[in-house]
Swiss-Prot record:
Residues 5-272 form the YjeF C-terminal domain. Its cofactor is Mg(2+). This is ADP-dependent (S)-NAD(P)H-hydrate dehydratase. Gene3D superfamilies: 3.40.1190.20. It catalyses: (6S)-NADHX + ADP = AMP + phosphate + NADH + H(+); (6S)-NADPHX + ADP = AMP + phosphate + NADPH + H(+). One of its GO terms (molecular function) is ADP-dependent NAD(P)H-hydrate dehydratase activity.
Length: 278
């Protein structure tokens, strides 16, 4: 295993050109948030927005519209029950994040199937939360494009068939190879599995053990892969920065909340963008 290093982050997060516009930094759609779990998609969308995604669209249950408008006025919202509208918009997206707060009912299952069928190269796909449970319950074809799954250990057990106690780096890497997608397995020391190697995140703190932390990471990953060309480096940088911010906050806090991480993402990205490169 290799550690995710600050060198990876600093070569990924670069200064923005002076003539930039929002179209340069990716169009991202985040899909999730049923009537009971609207907070999950709000936290994911917040992280994507603060990570610098150019245009953010949230497809969610209408019960979440008011909260989304109030908490994140930068994001556009659509009703995820209107499948035709969703798929028409999805065709123009650079990145799709599906799963935070999605649930596992029939509506969620049909939505996941439709999104997987519609996603295409060169779009990038982040699969998180409930969508991973649905994939574990029923295997279905995955699009031939850049995909990252972001399971915690129990979700990885369902998806890979490997019991938590047996989730060694070797076993996990074998499972990742079979699945054919990048895997971010969240644990005390999160590990990232690519076709070529295994990475481990040196950061992380028990202060992060609270609901919504994974939703925030999924949104960060979506925001990073929407604007940075190297898919692997973008994912690794999001994983690293998510924990690095939390570690700094935990120096003076017993608990770190997801939104506290999100609001600090631009500051940390700016810091890395200022590092002089050879």
């Amino acid at each position: 295993m290799q550690p995710i290093t600050t060198e990876i982050v600093s070569r990924t997060i670069i200064k923005r050109p002076a003539d930039s516009h929002k179209g340069n930094y990716g169009r991202i759609m985040l899909i999730g948030g049923n009537q009971n779990f609207g907070g999950a998609i709000i936290m994911a969308a917040t992280a994507a927005t603060y990570s610098g995604a150019g245009l953010v669209t949230v497809a969610t249950d209408p019960s979440n519209f008011t909260s989304l408008h109030a908490r994140l006025p930068e994001a556009m919202v659509i009703d995820y029950h209107q499948t035709d509208t969703l798929l028409n918009l999805l065709a123009g997206m650079d990145v799709i994040v599906i799963g935070p707060g999605l649930g596992t009912d029939t509506v969620a299952d049909q939505l996941l199937t439709a999104v997987l069928a519609a996603t295409h190269v060169p779009q990038r796909l982040v699969i998180d939360g409930s969508a991973l449970t649905l994939l574990a319950q029923q295997a279905r074809p995955l699009p031939a494009t850049d995909i990252v799954v972001t399971p915690h250990q129990m979700e990885w057990q369902r998806l890979s068939g490997i019991a938590i106690k047996d989730q060694t780096p070797t076993a996990n890497h074998d499972a990742q190879q079979r699945l054919g997608v990048m895997a971010v397995v969240k644990a005390h020391r999160t590990t990232v599995y690519t076709d070529e190697r295994v990475w481990f995140n040196p950061g992380g703190t028990p202060a992060m053990a609270t609901g919504g932390m994974g939703d925030t990471l999924a949104g960060m990953i979506g925001g990073f892969v929407s604007q940075f060309h190297n898919f692997t480096d973008a994912v690794l940088s999001a994983v690293y920065l998510h924990s690095a911010i939390a570690d700094d906050l935990a120096a003076t806090r017993y608990v770190v909340l997801p939104h506290q991480i999100s609001t600090r993402i631009p500051t940390y990205m700016h810091r890395f963008s200022q590092i002089e490169r050879p």
